[in-house]
């Protein structure tokens, strides 16, 4: 049964910090939401604590995704390129938490799988592997889940071309689907210019 009133974010921050101890690199509140950052080395252990600790009891993994922070350097951020972000829900305590863990190696990003804690992480982790190339150590079936068989690359990485590398079409002579280099021609996008304040009746 869920509690009627959600815990205050600042209180949840303190509860999470106390439960994780030195496993938490930081616990912050922004826009009424609590985010905890943990190290890759202690990620699985921290998630187990968040799942079972009496004041946490995050029974549900709502979402898990990869993030590519490579363009954040343009605004002065330094640090690892890839992170895994999870959103947890405690039904019994009516509280939510965001967990972020950075992969230590940009060339071969790896974090532990949390499928042993939440079985529902299975497809989430496969999606993050497929789209970002993040490897989840301990996942027993880490196959692509969205892209085609034989797909090369990871399309949500920010250095992956928007048009992709290949396209597929049906070849009537061979009577099968074939792959070929992308034939989309690059085009320049001209920004819309509003010439007067009430142009198009928008103002």
Curated annotation (Swiss-Prot):
Its membrane topology is listed as: Peripheral membrane protein
State which Enzyme Commission number(s) the record gives.
Answer: 7.1.1.-
UniProt superkingdom = Bacteria
Where is it mostly found? membrane
- Does the record bear Transport in its keywords? yes
The cross-references to InterPro entries, in alphabetical order and at most eight, read:
NADH_DH_suC, NADH_quin_OxRdtase_su_C/D-like, NADH_UbQ_OxRdtase_30kDa_su, NADH_UbQ_OxRdtase_CS
Annotated Gene Ontology MF terms? NADH dehydrogenase (ubiquinone) activity; NADH:ubiquinone reductase (non-electrogenic) activity; quinone binding
Catalytic activity, reaction form: a quinone + NADH + 5 H(+)(in) = a quinol + NAD(+) + 4 H(+)(out)
Keyword Ligase in the entry? The reply is: no
Q: Where is the protein found, in the record's own terms?
A: Cell inner membrane
User: Per UniProt, which keywords does this protein have?
Assistant: Cell inner membrane, Cell membrane, Membrane, NAD, Quinone, Translocase, Transport, Ubiquinone
User: What does this chain do?
Assistant: NDH-1 shuttles electrons from NADH, via FMN and iron-sulfur (Fe-S) centers, to quinones in the respiratory chain. The immediate electron acceptor for the enzyme in this species is believed to be ubiquinone. Couples the redox reaction to proton translocation (for every two electrons transferred, four hydrogen ions are translocated across the cytoplasmic membrane), and thus conserves the redox energy in a proton gradient.
**What NCBIfam families does UniProt report for this protein, alphabetically?**
NuoC_fam, PRK06074.1-1
Xref: HAMAP family: NDH1_NuoC (MF_01357)
Q: What quaternary arrangement does the UniProt entry report?
A: NDH-1 is composed of 14 different subunits. Subunits NuoB, C, D, E, F, and G constitute the peripheral sector of the complex.
What family name appears in the similarity comment? Answer: Belongs to the complex I 30 kDa subunit family.
Question: What is the protein's name according to its record?
Answer: NADH-quinone oxidoreductase subunit C
